[in-house]
Amino acid sequence: MVSSSTTVPRSGVYYFSQGWKLVTLPGIRRFVILPLLVNIVLMGGAFWWLFTQLDAWIPSLMSHVPDWLQWLSYLLWPIAVISVLLVFGYFFSTLANWIAAPFNGLLAEQLEARLTGATPPDTGILGIMKDVPRIMKREWQKLAWYLPRAIVLLVLYFIPGIGQTIAPVLWFLFSAWMLAIQYCDYPFDNHKVPFKTMRAALRTQKVANMQFGALTSLFTMIPVLNLFIMPVAVCGATAMWVDCWRAKHALWK
């Protein structure tokens, strides 16, 4: 169990695994339902459609492989599939998080209160509605930060050779970091921590955050498991917040 006192930060793998346990806590499960439903509808529908299109998309991607790399086509084909899953999964994960942002924030708040014994501000439907403009402004901040970087990486996919070798690795690392930002931001935002300050705080635990984001990214690509990943990641990130940053940044005790 995570405590409210300052503890030695653990690995991102630990916090990701904790997320799967924390979503089942009595009293927390009811706050998991709405984020879970949003994720099931969006990710389930999106990946069903994606798998009906892969037969057409992958040959199109492989057509950009230069002649001098054709001898590696048997290795590049699975890389192309993984690339499509990574990009597609990240974009739809971002969309799902946009829609579920108010409910993810509420889940993070209630879990933090459960883990620490602290008393959160009064919440509920009216509280969520009141906070929606601020929450969506925060989502726009994240989008404005990530979109230019994502566009640069997507352009690399169209460069012969680089697009089939280096670009997928760079995209995976980028999506891992962005997913760490996405999910860790919920408890930070609950305490009105500025976006820039939040990113600086995450950099103090780079390895743990990359591990956490990488696992979240991988599970986003796996059918069935990806339907449950949103509330799991929110809970894991909240546990990390309690251990690593709450003592310094908490607005309510």
UniProtKB/Swiss-Prot annotation:
The keyword Cell membrane applies. One of its GO terms (cellular component) is plasma membrane. Its main location: membrane. GO terms for molecular function: high-affinity sulfate:proton symporter activity. It is found in: Cell inner membrane. The keyword Lipid metabolism does not apply. It is a multi-pass membrane protein. It comes from the Bacteria. Keywords: Amino-acid biosynthesis, Cell inner membrane, Cell membrane, Cysteine biosynthesis, Membrane, Sulfate transport, Transmembrane, Transmembrane helix, Transport. InterPro entries: CysZ_sulfate_transptr, Sulfate_CysZ. The chain crosses the membrane at residues 31-51, 72-92, 151-171, 222-242. GO terms for biological process: cysteine biosynthetic process; sulfate assimilation. Belongs to the CysZ family. High affinity, high specificity proton-dependent sulfate transporter, which mediates sulfate uptake. Provides the sulfur source for the cysteine synthesis pathway. This is Sulfate transporter CysZ. It comes from Salmonella paratyphi A (strain AKU_12601). The gene is cysZ.
